[in-house]
């Protein structure tokens, strides 16, 4: 029996009445290399005095280098991109992206989704969303969600890098996402949010 995989997830979004989008990225690595990937993430953070590696705090050269190094690691990245995302609708968009993400990850052998922790009530919303999404899975499916602060789990940083690269691509900076092309599956979904 195969060991269920863990996906590490983070998000990025752009609110806009017409062109808004929500990116939910999940990074999945073979369990045997989790420690290796953690070390890579710590190395990418370098000597910067930050608690975690974060796409938006890197310059373009660092972003491209990070994407290149992440692409060299065995694993895959599932991304759901929801549109539209008008102002104050990002939580609804997140739920739509997360629902689809659960189904896709389960089909790839993932049984545990570890997401970056947010406020307690927002974490509860994620748990409720996953509980609802499980109805689309086989009755015997074992799929659970947990939350952790990114400062405690560098594997979440990999998902931040993927989400950032996809967001940047949508905003016209194509190189980082192109480097991840061979290990990334991106699915576009309608958030059902309509326009503001």
Segments predicted by a language model, with ranges:
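Phosphate-ester processing/binding pockets and catalytic centers
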Residues: 1-196
């Amino acid at each position: 029996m195969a060991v269920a995989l863990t996906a590490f997830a983070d998000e990025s979004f752009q609110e806009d009445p017409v062109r808004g989008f929500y990116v939910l990225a999940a990074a999945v690595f073979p369990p045997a290399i989790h420690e290796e990937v953690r070390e890579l993430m710590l190395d990418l953070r370098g000597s910067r005095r930050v608690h975690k590696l974060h796409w938006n705090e890197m310059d373009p050269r660092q972003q491209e280098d990070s994407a290149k190094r992440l692409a060299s690691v065995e694993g895959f990245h599932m991304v759901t991109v929801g549109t539209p995302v008008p102002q104050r609708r990002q939580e609804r968009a997140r739920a739509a992206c997360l629902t689809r993400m659960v189904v896709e990850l389960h089909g790839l052998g993932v049984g545990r989704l570890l997401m970056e922790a947010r406020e307690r009530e927002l974490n509860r919303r994620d748990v409720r969303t996953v509980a609802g999404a499980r109805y689309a899975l086989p009755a015997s499916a074992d799929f659970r969600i947990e939350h952790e602060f990114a400062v405690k789990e560098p594997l979440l940083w990999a998902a931040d890098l993927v989400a950032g690269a996809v967001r940047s691509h949508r905003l016209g900076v194509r190189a980082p996402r192109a480097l991840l092309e061979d290990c990334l599956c991106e699915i576009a979904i309608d958030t059902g949010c309509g326009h503001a």
